[in-house]
Swiss-Prot record:
Function of the protein: This protein binds to the 23S rRNA, and is important in its secondary structure. It is located near the subunit interface in the base of the L7/L12 stalk, and near the tRNA binding site of the peptidyltransferase center.
Family under the similarity heading: Belongs to the universal ribosomal protein uL6 family.
GO biological process: cytoplasmic translation
Gene: rplF
Protein name (Swiss-Prot/TrEMBL): Large ribosomal subunit protein uL6
One Gene Ontology CC term in the entry: cytosolic large ribosomal subunit
Length: 178
């Protein structure tokens, strides 16, 4: 049995979970999320808890059970409290600005980079060039943050680039003079 998959998922107040036709729908204060359900796993909603139950006990299915439990738990957390990711832009002349749903980045290239934000993701840029991304879909939020970071990943010598706020860059020593 999957240890993660066996844990029940608490349903907060003002959050509604429904399962129909192999699709799980979670609706809460911040919005609504839908996801297809794996055919080898069932969701049982009892009171204010959701449990993920495998249809057949097999090793691969218990792995899927843990995955589905994590995905549904992220959906419940997303529609009730939401997710947040902070990126830092480091470097001389590097800056970030927000124009509507487009993030304008100056990253040391010969041209500015315009990054359109996907629907469901909101961004804020403060004076210290910190980009705060928020959304209810954890998967979409993480992919958006990774795509922005990939535009100019941090380099190990001076630390210039875009990095996650909690990320620690291991610095290398540069060349020593003659």
């Amino acid at each position: 049995m999957s240890r993660v998959g066996k844990k029940p998922i608490p349903i907060p107040a003002k959050t509604k979970v429904t399962v129909s036709n192999g699709t799980v729908t979670v609706q809460g204060e911040k919005g609504k999320l839908e996801r297809p359900l794996h055919p080898d796993v069932e969701l049982k909603i009892e009171g204010d808890e959701i449990t993920v139950v495998p249809v057949v006990e097999r090793r691969k299915i218990t792995a899927v059970q843990g995955l589905v439990r994590s995905l549904v738990a992220n959906m419940v957390t997303g529609v009730s409290t939401g997710f947040k990711r902070v990126l830092e832009v480091n470097g001389i002349g590097y800056k970030a600005e927000l124009n509507g749903q487009t993030l304008n980045l100056t990253l040391g290239f010969s041209h500015p980079v315009d990054f359109p934000l996907p629907q469901g993701i909101t961004a804020e840029v403060d004076k210290k060039n910190n980009i705060t991304l928020e959304g209810i879909d954890n998967e979409l939020l993480g992919q958006t943050a990774a795509s922005i970071r990939a535009l100019r990943p941090p380099e190990p010598y001076k630390g210039k680039g875009i990095k996650y706020a909690e990320e620690r860059i291991i610095r290398k020593a540069g060349k020593t003079g003659a």
